Amino acid sequence: MVAINPKKNLHFGENPPEINLNSNLKRWFSRNIGLWKSNRTYFLDEAQKTYNLSMNINIQALESKSEWESHYKFTWYPEKKYNFFDENPQYKERGEMHAFLKGHQLKRENFYLSDDEGISNIKQVDEHEMIFESSYKDWYILEHTRLLDSDNYRFRVIYSWNKNKLKIVENHHEIKIIK
């Protein structure tokens, strides 16, 4: 019998890898890097209203101190001025979020509807789609994100429950502008 790796104590430096490090997840996130035009429809339960708006989302990979973690910056801003943000001040018209992958989780410095940090658990449907599950304060968020047509398009649907009542449903059709 041949020992492939006879060393029992491998040294990975200061930042050892997580056993469940998923290169597919890192690869999927790298496919999302770039500037996206996001055409959105929001269905809001409270107001019983539907809104359509266009946003820009920029996703950037950041340098990381750990070779085992992938860090990202997400920035968003509207294509033009919308009454939506005046009528619904809980939504941020523009903003920035830093997050990093650790295993099958996305650790966020803040969320879209909150400045609280938290974790999104990630499930991989196939090589093109991920599901993100997040909980913070009284919110439970379920987001499906699918890459299409050689990563030139993304389709996202987001369901948001507050205190176990469905409050927001969002559909986002996104077109990659800059890779």
Features from the language model and the residues they span:
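Amphipathic/hydrophobic helical signal segments and adjacent flexible N-terminal regions
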Residues: 1-94, 168, 176-179
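Calycin-type beta-barrel ligand-binding domains and close structural analogs
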Residues: 2-17, 80-179
